[in-house]
Design a protein with these regions (language model features):
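Arg/Lys-rich, low-complexity, intrinsically disordered basic segments
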Residues: 259-320
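Charge-rich (especially acidic), low-complexity segments
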Residues: 130-260
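Generic recognition of well-structured, leucine-rich alpha-helical segments
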Residues: 11-24, 36, 65, 69, ...
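Short, charged low-complexity linear motifs
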Residues: 37-47, 177, 288-295
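Strand-helix-loop interaction patch of compact alpha/beta domains
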Residues: 1-100, 104-111, 115
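Short amphipathic C-terminal alpha-helix that caps PH/PH-like domains
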Residues: 113-124
């Protein structure tokens, strides 16, 4: 059991998480009633990056000195063939300045669990190799190396961070299994993009300093695996698939098989649980605007730029 200050802050962290839009941000936590000093977290790879839709697990352990010192964080989406990020080691080490394991601004007592998870998600950007210090000066063919690394991360993001994590979920993270499967089922737009990118690379050999001895791309195999898994999950979660399909076909030439339902009030709870993986916030990146700037999103609703301690900016819905 931690100190009084530690327990108070952990309870506040849990409250912050309960107020968080987990599905929208792609950040999930499991708090153990038996051990409040440990939190299991799953961060979903951001859209339009090589990490998109991946399930990235973190084991977070707090000490009695929290929040005076940061917790210890271990990366648990592991595979011997690839290092997913210069800041995420194959051994599970996480290099982040606020954790005291990387150069840069350190931990402050105003930071919390959500701060850490958002910072971890920010590592999963479109060009992850640039996270390595001195990258611009160190590599001669830096553009070629960056492209090769993005390709490998994207490949293993599907093979390892999605399929392997669903089939061989690390101990302690089984609590996220249903969320993983439902998100996989709703991510068909991503799989189309993945196929468009990977299929022309079938049989090609990629090497990179973060990818061991190199990798041969087997996109045909994984493409069929996607189809098989989607079919299994449609059978397992028929409601999720039916609602998603209805939503994807809105505005198209689909014939309404039950027009009487047009007059019924929608079940907002059900719709929110099965919403497709489409953008609702403004299409422009939040980092282009000042904190507090408001703008109508793709959903027609008002969004505001929120700033975080890490320097990251995101579109969020203003609190009513």
């Amino acid at each position: 059991m931690g100190s009084k200050l530690c327990m108070k802050r952990l309870m506040r962290d849990r409250q912050r998480y309960d107020e968080l839009d987990s599905e929208g941000l792609g950040i999930y936590c499991h708090f153990s009633d038996e051990n409040m000093m440990n939190v299991k977290a799953m961060v979903i790879g951001p859209e339009e990056t090589p990490y998109e839709g991946g399930f990235y697990f973190f084991d977070i352990n707090f000490s009695n000195q929290y929040p005076l010192v940061p917790p210890k964080v271990n990366f648990c989406t592991l595979n011997s063939n690839v290092r997913f990020n210069p800041n995420l080691y194959k051994c599970g080490k996480v290099c982040l300045s606020i954790l005291g394991t990387w150069s840069g601004p350190g931990w402050t007592t105003t930071m919390n669990l959500i701060t850490i998870l958002i910072d971890l998600q920010s590592l999963m950007n479109d060009n992850p190799i640039q996270n390595e210090p001195g990258y611009e000066k160190r590599y001669w063919k830096k553009d070629e190396i960056a492209a090769s690394y993005r390709t490998l991360v994207s490949y293993y993001n599907l093979c390892v961070a999605q399929f392997q994590m669903m089939d061989m979920t690390p101990p302690g993270f089984e609590c996220f299994k249903e969320v993983m499967e439902r998100r996989f089922l709703k991510n068909e737009i991503f799989y189309k993009r993945w196929r468009d990118f990977m299929m022309p690379l079938e049989g090609q050999h990629f090497t990179n300093r973060y990818a061991g001895m190199g990798t041969i791309i087997h996109s045909n195999h994984w493409s069929s695996m996607i189809d098989d898994r989607l079919e299994q999950l449609r059978f397992k979660y028929p409601l999720c698939e039916d609602k998603q399909q209805d939503t994807l076909e809105l505005g198209g030439a689909k014939e309404d098989v039950n027009p009487e339902k047009d007059t019924e009030e929608p079940d907002t709870k059900t719709v929110s649980e099965v919403k497709p993986n489409t953008r609702k916030s403004p299409k422009e990146q939040a980092k282009l605007y000042e904190i507090g700037f408001t703008k109508a999103g793709e959903d027609g609703k008002l969004w505001v730029v929120k700033g975080y301690k890490s320097g990251m900016r995101r579109w969020v819905r203003p609190k009513s």
